[in-house]
Amino acid sequence: MARVKRGVTSHAKHKKVLKAVKGQWGRRKSTIRVAKQAMEKAMQYAYRDRRTKKREFKSLWIQRINAGVRSEGITYSKFINGLTKCGIKLDRKILAEIAYDSPEAFKTIVQKAQSALN
């Protein structure tokens, strides 16, 4: 039976790990064992924070909408209720963008939502 040598594959795996931890500090960037642990932990953080990012952006959008709406004298929840009643189907991302970039247009949307509530 032929002898199996795995030098090429293990070298490739090690290069892949070291490339992933490039920019780390100390032995995390040079020693395979420590670098592998650092890479796995970084991947865990990345996985977790890809989900956290969605929550954080949604809360940011809500804060921006709420700030714009309260300047018009209405609460966020009443504004969203008014939007659904008058049939305006804009998501929070777009509403926050409008409130941030063009307050005049946002003011008209708020007035339509208020008229739907009355």
From Swiss-Prot:
It comes from Pelagibacter ubique (strain HTCC1062). The gene is rplT. Belongs to the bacterial ribosomal protein bL20 family. GO terms for cellular component: ribonucleoprotein complex; ribosome. The lineage of its organism: Bacteria, Pseudomonadati, Pseudomonadota, Alphaproteobacteria, Candidatus Pelagibacterales. CDD domains: Ribosomal_L20. NCBIfam families: rplT_bact. The keyword Ribosomal protein applies. InterPro entries: Ribosomal_bL20, RIBOSOMAL_L20_CS, Ribosomal_protein_bL20_C. The keyword rRNA-binding applies. Signal peptide: none annotated. One of its GO terms (biological process) is translation. Pfam families: Ribosomal_L20 (PF00453). Keywords: Ribonucleoprotein, Ribosomal protein, RNA-binding, rRNA-binding. Binds directly to 23S ribosomal RNA and is necessary for the in vitro assembly process of the 50S ribosomal subunit. It is not involved in the protein synthesizing functions of that subunit. Disulfide bonds: none annotated. Gene3D superfamilies: 6.10.160.10, Ribosomal protein L20. This is Large ribosomal subunit protein bL20. One of its GO terms (molecular function) is rRNA binding.
